[in-house]
Amino acid sequence: MRRFLLILLTVLAAASLSAQGKIRELLAAKAPEGCVEQSWDVDGVKRTALVRVPNGVTGPLALVFCWHGHGGRSTHSARHWGYPEIDKTSILVFPQGLPTVSPLVDKEGRMPGWQTSVTSEGGRDLRLFDVMLADLKKKHAVDERRIYSMGHSNGAAFSYLLWQARPDALAAIGSVAGSLRGDGKPTTPLPVIHVAGKKDPLVKFAWQQATFAAVRRINGCAEEGQPWAKEGVLDATIYASSKGAPLVTALHEGGHEYAKGSTELIVRFFRENPKGK
C-alpha cells in the first residue's frame, strides 16, 4: 500500500510539474517581431489583440483572425503557431480571450477563452469580432474577399460559431482540434479546413468526425475524398463541393495538440479559397 501511495504521489507531482511548466510557457511567451498590441472598447470592457500588418505589401490585404484555445494567450499563439513566419502577406490578428466557462475543462470560468454559443457570455466575443473587423477595415486596405478565421480547440469552435453567426463576413475557416457544436448549425456553405488528432482525449475524434459529416452536408461535399497534401505529421484529404465550399480534413495520430504542419496547410487552403471563387 505504501509503495502504491509513493507511486501515486510521484505521478501526481510529475503531472503538476508538467502543468506548471505549460503555464510558465504560456505566460513567458513574447509577441513575435511586428506583432503590436491594439485595444478596443467593447461594451465598456477593454479588449486586446496582437496585430501584425505586413511591411512592403501593396494592394488590398487578406485578414486572418487567429483564436487561441481555452486557457491560452495571444502571445503564445502568435509565437508558437508560426503564422507570422509562414504567411508574410496577410494582416494577422491574435485576440486575447476573457475568463470563460468551459463545460469540458473550466466549469468555474477562471481561464481565458471564447463564448461557445451565439447567446453565451452575453455575445461579447461576437461583438469583439465585429468591432475589430470594422476598425481594421477603416485603418487598412482589407480585401473583402479574403477575410478568414482559424483557431485551436475553443478558438476553433469559435471559428465554427463565426461561420454560424457571421457567415457573410468570412471567406473560409480553419479548425485545429475543434468541433461544430450541436446547438447551432451554419446554413450558408463555407470552405472549411479541419485538423484532427485521432487520439484527442479532450475533443473526441468521434465528435470531430461528426463535424466532418455535418460540414459535408452543409457544403454539398462528395462523400469520398481525394488526397490533397502531406505536411508535417498531417495527411490531408479534400472533399469537393458542388457549392464551391470544399472541406479539407488533415489527420494525425496524436491528440489535442496544435499539430506540426497545421499552419502551413491552413495558409495554403485560405489562399486557394477567396470568397466567390
Question: Over which residues does each language-model region extend?
Answer:
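Cap/lid segment of the alpha/beta-hydrolase catalytic domain
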Residues: 96-126
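Conserved acidic catalytic loop of the alpha/beta-hydrolase fold
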Residues: 127-145
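Hydrophobic h-region of N-terminal signal peptides that target proteins for export
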Residues: 9-18
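A domain-start/cap signature at the N-terminus of enzymes
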Residues: 17-63, 75-76, 90, 117, ...
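Conserved alpha/beta-hydrolase "acid-adjacent" motif
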Residues: 202-207, 258-260
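Short substrate-entry loop that stabilizes the transition state in hydrolases
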Residues: 57-105, 157, 170, 176-178, ...
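Short glycine-rich catalytic loops that host catalytic nucleophiles or stabilize transition states
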Residues: 197, 249-255
